[in-house]
From Swiss-Prot:
Residues 75-103, 176-339 are annotated as: Disordered. Keywords: Acetylation, Isopeptide bond, mRNA processing, mRNA splicing, Nucleus, Phosphoprotein, Repeat, Repressor, RNA-binding, Ubl conjugation. Residues 2-72, 110-183 form the RRM domain. Residues 185-250, 321-339 have a biased composition (Basic residues). This is Serine/arginine-rich splicing factor 6. Plays a role in constitutive splicing and modulates the selection of alternative splice sites. Plays a role in the alternative splicing of MAPT/Tau exon 10. Binds to alternative exons of TNC pre-mRNA and promotes the expression of alternatively spliced TNC. Plays a role in wound healing and in the regulation of keratinocyte differentiation and proliferation via its role in alternative splicing. Binds SREK1/SFRS12. Interacts with DYRK1A. The modification Phosphoserine is found at S45, S81, S84, S297, S299, S303, S314, S316. One of its GO terms (molecular function) is pre-mRNA binding. CDD domains: RRM2_SRSF4_like. Residues 280-291 have a biased composition (Basic and acidic residues). The modification N6-acetyllysine is found at K165. The lineage of its organism: Eukaryota, Metazoa, Chordata, Craniata, Vertebrata. InterPro entries: Nucleotide-bd_a/b_plait_sf, RBD_domain_sf, RRM2_SRSF4/6, RRM_dom, RRT5_SRSF_SR.
């Protein structure tokens, strides 16, 4: 059956006033009055079309009312129905308690926050009022805070229509304010368990992202540290190799041909032997120079040329032999002078 919505009704309006207002537009099957609005059901759809066309923006009890076709489904609740039980064909009141009989409410993402809501307005009144914009799936009033409610629609177009059309309208003497509750922006209130679950999921995701970021940062730091350590080690090794090559190159110039031939031979004790050899030729060189100069001045035949020694111990005897030759030559010279 065609239903017609009546908006901006006076709070003093009665069923008789509605009946007089729609008189001459066919037979009325049901009148459902709410706080500030109502619904009227016609027997014929053509009568409903004529009433919407003729009576929209007309005055009823001092108020300009809105008359248009109802968009939501018909509800057998909280209304005044026209029935045959009264016998005389009058209006009999029939009220039912609780939520509608269409099952549990369906939660959607197309949610509006209703602010400045009258304390006399229940969630049933809010849901019935919002049905003029589209199909309402969920409604709640004064649950988290007083004077605030929640309304959810089946589609985004219905929510947008309610936001554009019903924002600032009056319910029970108060002009309501509608605010779109976007799922991306975290609102300061949570009206359902699903929303709190989505928040916990977002928090867990953000924590996992932070932990993965910190892990990647620590891994990158450890990698950079290991790289810097490897670089320092390679540099120290290269410096040590350079210093070793320099130390090896210096004894070559002092040793001469013997040190060249000995340094080329590689064995396990090459380092210690090369050091002793590098020290011995220097001492040997000094002893050779002194012995050669002194033996040439005193006696050329008594100064034997020392062979290149293999160890540092063999370097001590040559200076002693030179001193013995000196003493012998001195004693001979003294005896000759005495004679």
């Amino acid at each position: 059956m065609p239903r017609v919505y009546i908006g901006r009704l006076s709070y003093n309006v009665r069923e008789k006033d509605i009946q007089r207002f729609f008189s001459g537009y066919g037979r009325l099957l049901e009148i459902d009055l709410k706080n500030g609005y109502g619904f009227v059901e016609f027997e014929d759809s053509r009568d409903a079309d004529d009433a919407v066309y003729e009576l929209n923006s007309k005055e009823l009890c001092g108020e300009r009312v809105i008359v248009e076709h109802a968009r939501g489904p018909r509800r057998d609740r909280d209304g005044y129905s026209y029935g045959s039980r009264s016998g005389g064909g009058g209006y009999s009141s029939r009220r039912t308690s609780g939520r509608d009989k269409y099952g549990p409410p369906v939660r959607t993402e197309y949610r509006l926050i209703v602010e400045n809501l009258s304390s006399r307005c229940s969630w049933q009144d809010l849901k019935d009022f919002m049905r003029q914009a589209g199909e309402v799936t969920y409604a709640d009033a004064h649950k988290e805070r007083t004077n605030e409610g929640v309304i959810e629609f089946r589609s985004y177009s219905d929510m947008k229509r309610a936001l554009d059309k019903l924002d600032g309208t009056e319910i029970n003497g108060r002009n309501i304010r509608l605010i779109e509750d976007k799922p991306r922006t975290s609102h300061r209130r949570s009206y359902s368990g699903s929303r709190s679950r989505s928040r916990s999921r977002r928090r867990s995701r953000s924590r996992s992202r932070r932990s993965s970021r910190s892990r990647s940062r620590s891994i990158s730091k450890s990698r950079s540290r290991s790289r810097s350590r490897s670089k320092g080690r390679s540099r120290s090794r290269s410096k040590g190799r350079k210093s070793r090559s320099k130390s090896k190159s210096k004894p070559k110039s002092d040793r001469g041909s013997h040190s060249h031939s000995r340094s080329r031979s590689k064995d396990k004790y090459g380092k210690s032997r090369s050091r002793s050899r590098s020290r011995s030729p220097k001492e040997n060189g000094k002893g050779d120079i002194k012995s050669k100069s002194r033996s040439r001045s005193q006696s050329r035949s008594h100064s034997p040329l020392p062979a290149p020694p293999s160890k540092a111990r063999s370097m001590s005897p040559p200076p002693k032999r030179a001193s013995r030759s000196r003493s012998r030559s001195r004693s001979r010279s003294r005896s000759s002078s005495r004679d």
